Amino acid sequence: MDMAAKFQDQTVFHMTGKRAGESLTALTTGFRPALLAPYRDLTRLRYDYPVVLVEGDASREYVRSLSSVVGGLIAELAPRGIEGERLRKQLLRLERELRVLVADGTTGLLSDLWPEAAARAAGRDDGARDVLTRAAGALGIDGEVIDCSRALTERLVTRAWKSVNAEKARAFRLLVDHLIRKLSDILRAAFVHSQAGQQPQALKSGFGDLHRDTFDFSAMSKLVTRNVPKDELPAKRRQRIEWALAVLRSQPFYPGSRGSGAKGEPYAFEFDNCAAAIEAHRARLPRLVELVKAIAIAELEARGGYDEADHGPFFERYDEHALTADDLAQFPDYLVCIPADRNGAPENAAMMEMLSAGMPVKVLVQHGDLLEEAAIGQGHFAFGVRSARLATTAMGLGGLFILQSTSSNLYALRDRVRHGMGCRGPALFSVFSGSPDAAGNLAPYLSAAAAMKSRAFPAFTYDANAGTNWATRFSFENNRNTGDDWPVEEFAYADENVQRVNEQLRFTYADFMLCDQRNAHHFAVVPRERWTTAMIPASDWLLLPENQATDRVPYVMAVDGSDKLHRVIVDARLMQATRRCLLLWHRLQEHGGIHNSHAEQALAREKAAWQAQKEQELEALRKAAASATPAAAAPAAEPVAARAEAPVAAPTEAAPAPSSDQPWIETIRCSSCNECQNINDKLFGYDGNKQAFIKDLNAGTYKEMVEAAEACQVAIIHPGKPWNPNEPGLEELLERAKPFMA
């Protein structure tokens, strides 16, 4: 009897998720994917965490890994060669003790933790303790030491925001201080040359104490007042300058400017919910408009360029609609860090609207749970989408910087995080910070790394300002094997005969779900003696046609608490979720230019056309050779001539491509941003998947088609040639349409 037929309980479990009898055992606490077996004690590894959140705003390097800090210290203090080996080992031991301290929950500055770690690393060696303690003086930096915990994400992102904000503050204060000084000089000069400035007491105050008794200031006043101009500073100009000075000195956006006289507390820009940030922005907008207006007037007055006739009417009507991107870029962006347990709260329901409106805000959305147990069509999701789809949905809004990552990858993306904080306009940071405590005892770093590795939460960035196409805007960030469905790792283990076996394992979404003990009911452990030929790795099972997959049982490799290797079969429900995860990954791959369906179709058409052309050339050569006579003077010349005269198959005959003369839309790539429908909803329509197509050419103009192509965030609208030759302005429109031609 076939072993696969004998153990039908495995097939039953896969199909129903129910264990029959005692041959299959439940997945208990302590099981983890086989590829995570070597990482039970992270304190023994030198990797990116913990990190030091560097204090001070002078440096753009706002975060450093502990390993890089100690590595720099070794390079600076330890001599090269054998004589520096002892100090190198001592510093590496100290680094490990720091890592252990932080893993045990100890918090504080690096300078505070260093002495205790030095004492632990040195043990009873007082000399080593002194050396390690003195080494702290060469650190050159200090800051909070924090592990890859659930608290890391908000602190690291906030530190990046503060680093960017400090640069803005320095530039703004320099500008405001310069303008205050210039306007003050104008008023001071006007006063000195005025009647009041020529009075004896005013003249006396302008002299130092040493010579005050030497001069007769009353007589001096009579002499100088003869040359005082009759026209003092015009009243309107004086009033305008004094108003601008008062606004500049009292501005609450960047306290600490020259002559600052701001009343009340300076504005705070850090919030934990969207509603509060929106309310603050609206309340402060009039004050911001007033300050921008004052800066503009001050700059004109400082260079003597203010013209009452030209500038007066403009500034009288100056309001929030006159603000430009350059104006807003001078001020702090709002930072909204939404706690992981408040994503679905009412005060955060307007997040998407806030981002699409272009408000100067940076939003951090933290995800603490990727478990999706809701039935199809049921359940409530924060912001209306599942966690892993929030960032991809936001890409359709246009004009944003978007970063999706796990906390384990944040340090590697530190420069991208800071870049996003410095971008003009809104930005979204969507970060998975590790599974909750209820998921099991897997360290947050491993949980986050597993989510990224399994494609459950891949890392990418989207920068709308980086260029005009997906190649410049979208970037995968540190995902393994981006061209494959699943990342592949070499796995070594000992078989039942204690012989080394090397095997390549793929880390799938099912492996990630195995890390969460709340998913235990989706798995069943199979004893080695019951392994059958019907069992197949989950990654391979997903590649099978449906009629073949029903006869096979998918499994993943796992280890228990004692590192014993097991096969764990997966039920159909979780495999469906794994397939959905893979589908989303394929969509991301297309955004990144990997396995792009349009490119592959175009390549297939070109290959077919090339093959058809070669076949015709060969056929022409064969015919020419068959018709050639032995007495021909130049038999070799005929095939060449025949080849030149042979008809060549047009590429379009193999597989017709969209003509560049006809308007068309790459519907499958549509992000449902509504830009085209906002222009003309009769010309453009949505199909059942809410993706755009051309509904009726006669319902619109070529101008609307070109405008839609220019507005499309994913550049999928190709205007083709005008269908109405009498439409005005076609020459200009054709020039604008060139970048979007197929």
Range-by-range predicted roles:
Residues W664-N680, L697-A715:
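Cysteine-centered iron-sulfur cluster-binding motifs in ferredoxin-type domains/subunits
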Residues G368-L370, N409, F432-D437:
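Glycine-rich beta-alpha junction loops
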Residues G688-G700:
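Ferredoxin-type iron-sulfur electron-transfer modules in oxidoreductases and energy-metabolism complexes
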Residues A699-K703, G720-P739:
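Polybasic, low-complexity binding patches
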Residues Q330-P346, V361-L364:
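A short, small-residue-rich loop immediately preceding and capping a beta-strand
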